[in-house]
């Protein structure tokens, strides 16, 4: 009966109840209860990052297959991962981080540059890039820089919060005509940015790619990466291939291993059935990336979630926003 009643309380209420006495401190840590909260709530979370990603495989296992030590991790797993709990526990920006950002602004006198790529740019009914370029009330266009990259261009500069300029270099897999044909037919367009390596004909081929020289030049000069993932649940996805391409773009021989990766888990519009961001991070094997990353839910039509993601990647790049 206690368990049934506690299941109607919020996790925050349970934590307060647990602070009243030793008895409730023990009772509210019931692993079955916190596993229930995890399975119930994580599909509704709008972002997850490299510091808060829960162990999806452990959560999905039957309780009978877990030992006692593992069982007691569920409460900590929830508090670490839940966006609401993390906002309450988030410390103030530490002094040295602010100083680092200030020094970064003195040394780097050009606007930060971000490379944006991924199937969500090409497969969705609503174009994220087109919406960004025509939504001055959300993210105004600030200009087109003169710095050119051969075969790529200069990208587009935007303004965040009316004070911080940043530049996005959008990398498409192929021509606009081929992308549109693939979108209508719900096929994957041939990706001309990547060259597959290894034995493709092997019985168990491993996905491995290298990127073409023009894109390599982009990867060497950018401060971070935005990967636009198709989060719509109604079609098949090639997540292993996507992860291999993310690895190729962020390879350590092309630049610093500290450059962050923002994954915009994107759908066309509100009401579209989406893959939860926690499952997106799990499917893309982001825990295997040796760099900061964030998965942020986003909508192309309204640009919901976009600014949150941009703020995160700029802060991770050393920009005080």
Regions found by a protein language model. Name each.
Residues 2-109, 115:
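Skp1-binding F-box subdomain of Cullin-RING ligase substrate receptors
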Residues 11, 22-24, 32, 119-123, ...:
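Conserved beta-strand elements of beta-rich interaction domains across eukaryotes
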Residues 11, 99-104, 152-155, 210-215, ...:
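Eukaryotic intrinsically disordered and solvent-exposed regulatory patches
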Residues 105-142:
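Glycine-rich phosphate-binding P-loop
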Residues 125, 177-185, 207, 234-244, ...:
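Active-site-adjacent loop/helix micro-motif of nuclease/hydrolase catalytic cores
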Residues 133-183:
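Switch I (effector-binding) loop of TRAFAC-class P-loop GTPase G-domains
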Residues 184-202, 208-233:
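Inter-motif core of Ras-like GTPase G domains
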Residues 221-321:
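Conserved GTP-binding G-domain of TRAFAC-class P-loop NTPases and closely related GTPase folds
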